[in-house]
């Protein structure tokens, strides 16, 4: 398939130039309703997984993200994590690399096209991080992104399943 060949070619060139891993942004929520409502201009689930599957096949580790607290429902967050878990299982079984880290990202409504959204609460942040650790036990690291959650909440998140902080 031409698109897959171009993707493989591009990732191999980037790796040869020194790129060691991919950050994993752009996943948003793996749900057609959410994608159509809020992220029509983004790559979408199939494209996102194509990039990561190809990277894993050539030995490049990646991270995975989930942007939550906007228009998605709790069950759509769970489905997102289940899809990541299934992909990670496949990567661990048959590829040279896999996801190294999962980073749940709190949606910040201010200044966005979804500014009417309430955004996540601190409790939602902690629940999401804890559920992530339980559901994604096949991904080595769960990261609290303190820029979006505050430094104090990220510190608490270290007791809710996170083993890393960034920001």
Stretches with model-predicted labels:
Residues 1-5, 34-45, 114-119:
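Glycine-rich tight-turn/loop motif centered on a GG-T
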Residues 10-27, 46-113, 122-152, 156-159:
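Conserved C-terminal portion of the radical SAM core fold
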Residues 30-32:
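Glycine/Thr-rich phosphate-binding loops of Rossmann-like dinucleotide-binding domains
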Residues 164-167:
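Glycine-rich phosphate-binding active-site loops on the catalytic face of alpha/beta enzymes
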